[in-house]
């Protein structure tokens, strides 16, 4: 009886200790945390270690790996791996680790038999309670590269085979991030694991955010109102909150920012429509900016805008000397009729590349559609280019 009582006491202590550890341990699991059969492709979710926007503080973010059914079953060797930079999202349900539809960039690109690796990024997935640090170029590219390399290692651990070919893809916000990935690779970030990029296909990217701001201020109108609060909040965050939302947004609009953007419960269509209906014209999809921003916004020399303008230039890609010398080729896709990310962004990027001695690029500007519909065309354009792409020296493989 004494032995049974002693055994019960020991087991009770062990159980209490185990529960205490479970209650106090909130460290996220590193590695694969989910596998989903999406029909035409598979999605593997994983958590990985990276650093915060300051470049120093260790954090954990979530990401996804996408592969075709044949690659997943190991019937074929993948052609290579693509780093996919996600486009603008505001609802956590839009994150890469929640994608299941073939009618998505992830679904289309993974069925090219390249494996795609895409980070949820700041502010989504496992990091959903924080600011998404919108268009903070260097910081976003860094976590995207870290996700790509962590994902490739997991694929190796899982026994998947793929050619040593690296793609860099993205549209809209992903175009900006993709160009920043080219820049970090050129600077040698993790060069022992990622010495170069074989092919970059990006589209609709805000490469020159300062000129974009100037156009918005001069026109005093937006046809995609969700973008401006995201851009300004991203630059305010980049500046360490020396500027406050109240310094640039009207008092009436400020009251809605937290619910619209911080909650991560509303997608871009919902937010656009909310702003149109309350402050603009829902019929012709236009918004007079003066209805949501203060006069200081229109004066780049005003105190709040001085700091914001500094960070707009800092996170653009055309205001200091550099070239994507470790990216073999870049194909751009941008519509001259883009009402969200004006074509001036593409023109500035082209001038910058030529001025810095990089000519291994081409530009497709044949689309006559706006930003969103051109995004669909970008997906088809990229799929076609990938089907025809033969990396240098791999003619016998492809």
Stretches found by the model and what they are:
Residues 339-345:
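Conserved alpha/beta-hydrolase "acid-adjacent" motif
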Residues 134-156:
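Alpha/beta-hydrolase active-site loop
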Residues 60, 70-108:
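Short, surface-exposed "cap/lid" segments of acyl-processing enzymes
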Residues 331-338:
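Short beta-strand/loop motif that positions the catalytic acidic residue
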Residues 337, 358, 362-385:
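Histidine-bearing beta->alpha loop at or near hydrolase active sites
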Residues 22-77:
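Catalytic-loop region of hydrolases
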Residues 203-322:
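Accessory cap/linker subdomain of secreted extracellular hydrolases
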Residues 149-223:
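Primarily recognizes the serine-hydrolase "nucleophile elbow" in alpha/beta-hydrolase
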């Amino acid at each position: 009886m004494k032995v049974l009582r002693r055994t019960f006491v020991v087991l009770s202590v062990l159980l209490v200790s185990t529960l205490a550890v479970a209650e106090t341990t909130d460290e996220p699991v590193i590695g694969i945390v989910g596998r989903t059969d999406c029909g035409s492709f598979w999605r593997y979710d994983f958590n990985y270690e990276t650093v915060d926007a300051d470049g120093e503080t260790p954090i954990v973010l979530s990401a996804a790996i996408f592969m075709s059914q044949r690659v997943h079953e190991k019937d074929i060797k993948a052609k290579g791996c693509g780093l996919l930079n996600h486009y603008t999202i505001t609802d956590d349900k839009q994150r890469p680790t929640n994608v299941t539809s073939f009618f998505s960039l992830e679904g289309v690109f993974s069925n090219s038999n390249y494996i795609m690796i895409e980070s949820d990024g700041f502010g989504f997935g496992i990091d959903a309670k924080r600011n998404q640090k919108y268009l903070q170029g260097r910081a976003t590219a860094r976590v995207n590269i870290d996700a790509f390399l962590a994902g490739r290692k997991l694929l190796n651990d899982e026994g998947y085979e793929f050619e040593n070919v690296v793609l860099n893809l993205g549209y809209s916000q992903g175009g900006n991030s993709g160009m920043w990935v080219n820049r970090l690779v050129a600077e040698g970030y993790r060069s022992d694991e990622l010495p170069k990029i074989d092919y970059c296909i990006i589209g609709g990217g805000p490469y020159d955010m300062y000129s974009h701001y100037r156009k918005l201020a001069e026109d005093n109108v937006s046809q995609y109102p969700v973008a401006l609060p995201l851009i300004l909040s991203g630059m305010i965050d980049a500046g360490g909150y020396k500027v406050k939302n109240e310094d640039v947004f009207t008092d009436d609009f400020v009251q809605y920012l937290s619910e619209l953007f911080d909650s991560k419960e509303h997608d871009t269509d919902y937010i656009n429509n909310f702003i149109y209906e309350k402050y603009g014209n829902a019929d012709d999809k236009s918004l007079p900016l003066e209805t949501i921003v203060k006069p200081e916004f229109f004066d780049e020399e005003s105190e709040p805008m001085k700091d914001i303008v500094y960070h707009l230039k800092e996170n653009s890609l055309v205001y200091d000397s550099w070239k994507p010398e470790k990216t073999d080729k870049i194909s751009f896709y941008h519509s001259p009729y883009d009402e969200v990310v004006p074509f001036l962004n593409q023109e500035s990027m082209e001038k910058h590349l030529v001025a810095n001695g990089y000519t291994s690029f081409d530009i497709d500007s044949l689309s006559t559609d706006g930003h969103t519909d051109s995004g669909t065309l970008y997906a088809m354009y990229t799929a076609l280019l990938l089907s025809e792409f033969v990396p240098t020296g791999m003619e016998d493989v492809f």
